[in-house]
Amino acid sequence: MARVPEPTSEVMSYGYSDNENDLFFEADGPGKMKCCFQDLNNSYLEEEGIQLQISHQLHNKSLSHFVSVIVALEKLKKISVPCSLPLQGDDLMNVFHCIFEEEPIILEKCDDNAFVHDAPPRSLDCKFQDINQKSLVLYNSYELRALHLNGTSVNQQAVFRMTFVQEDEDITKIPVALCIKEKNLYLSCVMKDGKPTLQLEMLDPKVYPKKRMEKRFVFNKTEIKKKVEFESSQFPNWYISTSQAEAMPVFLGNNRGGHDITDFTMELSS
């Protein structure tokens, strides 16, 4: 590591501090600085009057010794010395090239999943009705049913928290997770008795929702003419569906556009 040479007694006689760093932190610097560099048996750099003294005893050097190298070189640019050419920025670069060795920095590929919790996912509170105006209602704690509500019974309508999640799917579809607000009950798609089935799962609110949900909780939302439908990401071509009959369970069906209802209207909830 290079450092600024120790000041000679000749420099000390000019009334400056015996602290070597003070020579370079003065506003204008000592007028006869070049004398500090005349009697050292070190290599010259392009005969510009700059010398480097290499220290092999780094254990007793404070931070100020190393900082002095940079400060001193900046001061030398402003000091008048009998040189054929003024000290230039390129000359300073040559000094640093003698001191430091450049090494490449190899960046390892980062795992995107490690940063999914940096920011909470965006979500909306909303209510749903099928196109026959049947509302979705939580029934017996772990079952969703679709039925017509009126009067005071409208308060039974379930409020959902729709969370926008990350999925590598068709960009024309929006991946979301659906949770019954206040209950932490998430709609999920699982295989039961050889058939894709819709169910409700209670999840830890300290962990969920998250940006990358397990695939069984993800639905690809599509909106056409103010009507929305939700296709299971776990089971493509299977949709959240309701029956034409009253007060029947909401289920997962693959009869899109048929007798079963797969289109819903969405109302934002405050």
Curated annotation (Swiss-Prot):
Pro-sequence residue ranges: 1-118
The keyword Secreted appears for this protein: yes
GO cellular component, one term: cytosol
GO molecular function (one): integrin binding
PROSITE patterns: INTERLEUKIN_1 (PS00253)
One of the protein's GO biological processes: positive regulation of cell division
Compartmental location: Cytoplasm, Cytosol; Secreted; Lysosome; Secreted, Extracellular exosome
Highest taxon, organism lineage: Eukaryota
Pfam families: IL1, IL1_propep
UniProt-annotated site: Important for interaction with integrin, residues: K173, K181, K183, K192, K206
Subcellular location, principal: cytoplasm
Keywords linked to the UniProt accession: Cytokine, Cytoplasm, Inflammatory response, Lysosome, Mitogen, Pyrogen, Secreted
Subunit annotation: Monomer. In its precursor form, weakly interacts with full-length MEFV; the mature cytokine does not interact at all. Interacts with integrins ITGAV:ITGBV and ITGA5:ITGB1; integrin-binding is required for IL1B signaling. Interacts with cargo receptor TMED10; the interaction is direct and is required for the secretion of IL1B mature form. Interacts with HSP90AB1; the interaction facilitates cargo translocation into the ERGIC. Interacts with HSP90B1; the interaction facilitates cargo translocation into the ERGIC.
Extra remark: IL1B production occurs in 2 steps, each being controlled by different stimuli. First, inflammatory signals, such as LPS, stimulate the synthesis and promote the accumulation of cytosolic stores of pro-IL1B (priming). Then additional signals are required for inflammasome assembly, leading to CASP1 activation, pro-IL1B processing and eventually secretion of the active cytokine. IL1B processing and secretion are temporarily associated.
Protein function: Potent pro-inflammatory cytokine. Initially discovered as the major endogenous pyrogen, induces prostaglandin synthesis, neutrophil influx and activation, T-cell activation and cytokine production, B-cell activation and antibody production, and fibroblast proliferation and collagen production. Promotes Th17 differentiation of T-cells. Synergizes with IL12/interleukin-12 to induce IFNG synthesis from T-helper 1 (Th1) cells. Plays a role in angiogenesis by inducing VEGF production synergistically with TNF and IL6.
Family named by the database record: Belongs to the IL-1 family.
Name of the protein in its database record: Interleukin-1 beta
Organism expressing this protein natively: Mustela putorius furo
Gene that produces this protein: IL1B
